[in-house]
């Protein structure tokens, strides 16, 4: 797939911008602070309804405006799609597909697929577990747009369950036993929580299995192959310890093979685990088990990548993760034109010459590649293509 037109209204620094794009390589050259990253950020938002730079939508709306508008004309296999997202300051965001009536913004997820490489990707290796969980969830959302609804439902149930546990914490501090009403209510929320948690865990485990061989292959191609990149999903179900026979049975037997467990089996695991740690959860006032507390452990050779990888190795691991997600999306047979758009935002300036050349060679064959760079010398020769200058007066072709 590729984007042939991108239009912005009141997005970031742009009051208005209209940009024609081509298949193949498109390179945006401009000094820092002039808005080249804003252009690819808009494309990323059109694909994922999120920004790689900020967690809230507010900064995306130009100062003084009430809303921002992103429009894109997408060619996907034999289809041509007109996509539009309206980012609002004071009401829910909306979207349009082929200029039809407005729909929930979530309805456009999965139509445009992008894989974005950015300096922030170092947090995939060096950052907290939430960054790696989000990496899996973002890929799942691209592969299966309905996953966004599952994740939203899980977060809603988690919030409700935490509120209930906090209300019970006061009774615990005063040494009062939980009331019958609390126990009956928490059991209902346990069931809701376990159902959603099991589906979320199962989806993450499956997509990680798809990623593992691609991660390893990409890392070998980026480096001299002296170390092996590995990944392991550590579920909070793996490690909970309790005296009950049921809990011990789960910990010692099936938790080691969660990948092959059914959603129904995982649901039962969660219910038993929640029952086993209920008193601790009441004392803490929060949910101690669930996908929101899981970790994806990255290994490099015999050591964890986090804390042990050098700066260059950290970059190679981060690039391998992004390349692996590209390969998984490209191999998806569910849609026509699955090849995602690759976006490399100020990445080459961060890499040594060897990694620059290898990465450029690996992405050059994609259907569309968008690159941002401060100067021409930052762009490897392997990525020859259209040059677009971004300056204080606008966006123009070379």
Curated annotation (Swiss-Prot):
InterPro entries: DNA-binding_RecF (IPR001238), DNA-binding_RecF_CS (IPR018078), P-loop_NTPase (IPR027417), RecF/RecN/SMC_N (IPR003395), RecF_2 (IPR042174)
GO CC field: cytoplasm
Gene3D superfamilies recorded: P-loop containing nucleotide triphosphate hydrolases, RecF/RecN/SMC, N-terminal domain
Gene Ontology biological process terms, A to Z: DNA replication; DNA synthesis involved in DNA repair; double-strand break repair; SOS response
Organism: Renibacterium salmoninarum (strain ATCC 33209 / DSM 20767 / JCM 11484 / NBRC 15589 / NCIMB 2235)
NCBIfam families given in the database record: recf
Residue positions binding ATP: 30-37
Family: Belongs to the RecF family.
Keywords, alphabetical: ATP-binding, Cytoplasm, DNA damage, DNA repair, DNA replication, DNA-binding, Nucleotide-binding, SOS response
GO molecular function: ATP binding; single-stranded DNA binding
Protein's gene: recF
UniProt protein name: DNA replication and repair protein RecF
Location relative to the cell: Cytoplasm
Role this protein plays: The RecF protein is involved in DNA metabolism; it is required for DNA replication and normal SOS inducibility. RecF binds preferentially to single-stranded, linear DNA. It also seems to bind ATP.
């Amino acid at each position: 797939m590729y984007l042939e037109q991108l239009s912005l209204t009141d997005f970031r620094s742009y009051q208005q911008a209209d940009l024609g794009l081509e298949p193949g390589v498109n390179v945006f050259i401009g000094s820092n602070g002039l808005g080249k990253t804003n252009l690819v950020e808009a494309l990323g938002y059109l694909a994922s309804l999120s920004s790689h730079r900020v967690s809230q939508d507010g900064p995306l709306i130009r100062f003084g405006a009430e809303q921002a508008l992103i429009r894109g004309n997408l060619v996907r296999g034999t289809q041509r799609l007109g996509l539009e997202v309206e980012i609002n300051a004071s009401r829910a965001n909306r979207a349009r597909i082929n200029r039809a009536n407005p729909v929930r913004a979530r309805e456009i997820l999965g139509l445009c697929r992008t894989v974005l490489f950015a300096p922030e990707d170092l947090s995939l290796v060096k950052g907290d577990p939430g960054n790696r969980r989000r990496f899996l969830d973002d890929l799942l959302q691209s592969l299966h747009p309905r996953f966004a609804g599952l994740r939203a439902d899980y977060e809603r149930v988690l919030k409700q369950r935490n509120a209930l546990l906090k209300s019970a914490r006061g009774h615990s501090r005063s040494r009062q036993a939980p009331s019958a009403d609390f126990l009956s209510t928490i059991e209902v929320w346990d069931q809701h929580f376990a159902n959603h948690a099991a589906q979320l865990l199962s989806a993450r485990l499956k997509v990680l299995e798809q990623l593992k061989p691609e991660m390893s292959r990409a890392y070998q191609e980026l480096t001299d192959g002296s170390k092996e990149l590995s990944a392991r999903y550590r579920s909070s179900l793996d490690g909970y310890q309790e005296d009950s026979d049921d809990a011990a049975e789960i910990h010692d037997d099936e938790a080691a093979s969660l990948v092959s467990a059914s959603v129904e089996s995982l649901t039962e695991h969660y219910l038993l685990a929640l029952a086993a740690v209920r008193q601790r959860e009441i004392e803490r006032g929060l949910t101690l088990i669930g996908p929101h507390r899981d970790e994806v452990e990255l290994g490099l050779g015999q050591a964890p990548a986090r804390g042990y990888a050098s700066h260059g190795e950290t970059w190679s691991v981060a690039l391998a993760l992004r390349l692996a997600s590209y390969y998984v999306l490209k191999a998806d047979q569910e849609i026509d034109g699955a090849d995602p758009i690759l976006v490399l935002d100020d990445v080459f300036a961060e890499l040594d010459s060897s990694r620059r050349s290898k990465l450029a060679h690996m992405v050059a064959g994609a259907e569309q590649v968008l690159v941002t760079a401060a100067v021409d010398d930052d762009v490897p020769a392997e990525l020859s293509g259209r040059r677009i200058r971004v300056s204080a007066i606008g966006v123009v072709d070379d």
